[in-house]
Amino acid sequence: MVTMNRNKVVIVGTGQVGATAAFGIVTHGLCNELVLIDCSAAKALGEARDLDDGSEFQDRHVKVRAGDYADCKDADIVVITVGRKPPANSNRMAELGFTVGLVGEVVDNVMASGFDGVIVMVSNPVDVMAWYAWKRSGLPRTQVLGTGTALDTSRLKTIIGEETGLDPRNVGGFVMGEHGDSQFTAWSTVSLGGKPFARFLADNQDRFASVSTTEIEEKTRTRGNEIVAAKGGTNFGIASTVAGIVQTILWDERRIVPVSTLLDGEYGEHDVFLGVPTELRANGANEIVELDLSEDERAKLHHSAELVREHCEGLL
């Protein structure tokens, strides 16, 4: 992989998610240069100018401009957000037929520029699209990843915070598998204040007798659909997730994030992208952290892998 000054990010797709992700990157001053690409050049230009107009009030100036695929050549990260708003209560896999053509065209154009950075896939179904982008791009496995279950994990922590009244940042643990209906909460990994969550509830029955892990997991799974039904789409949560992943990679933070990455023997799976805890570094998905899951959790992970793999068949 080419060694670069970690300072340039390209976002392809300036809809709600792409534009909000750009706003997060700019407000946090994550890079020196941010380039926006869209099928509508006017839309990309408008978003870039709107973002740049607030530069006086940012902690760090980020140069924002509209561009084209040639700008990907020396980019450190390309974020792909192309797609359309899903209807309420829809399965993310239902977007596959529409999205795959868009993603294929984007990946081809990105690679034609000479790009050798990290692709961060956001487009749904994200696990399938990350696998497709990896296969189509020819990049090493570390350099293609999806947002995976990072947002779902954040939702889990938020909901546990709502149920207990405690700061969600006290919660540890992961949602794993597909970013979709077959995702699962790996309860064996969940802790609150360093104490296993099941034990925390048992030790505080007088306060949290009404807290149900089954209900928490279902709320986590359906949270996205509820937001879509209420406001027509999701953008803030996923955009914050994207900004966090971008920061972790650009700044080589070595954070462990449940992104969608290629399993090649880990958890007994091969040739499939799933949301699993992964150490993120400047080179992308540096190393998968293989957790000691329960037998039930492993079965759920394998089930999720089967579903994702089925939808990958025939795409190439």
UniProtKB/Swiss-Prot annotation:
Instruction: Tell me where it mainly resides.
Output: cytoplasm
Binding of substrate: at which residues?
A: R92, N124, P125, V126, D127, D152, T153, S154, R155, T234
Q: Name one GO biological process term.
A: glycolytic process
* Enzymatic class: oxidoreductase
Q: Among its keywords, does the record have NAD? A: yes
> Which residues are recorded as binding NAD(+)?
V17, D38, K43, Y69, V122, S123, N124, T147
Q: Which Pfam families match?
A: Ldh_1_C (PF02866), Ldh_1_N (PF00056)
- The entry's active site is H179
Q: Its Enzyme Commission number?
A: 1.1.1.27
What keywords tag this UniProt record? Answer: Cytoplasm, NAD, Oxidoreductase
NCBIfam families named in the record: L-LDH-NAD (TIGR01771), PRK00066.1 (NF000824)
Q: What is this protein called?
A: L-lactate dehydrogenase 1
Organism, scientific name = Bifidobacterium longum (strain NCC 2705)
The upper taxonomy is:
Bacteria, Bacillati, Actinomycetota, Actinomycetes, Bifidobacteriales
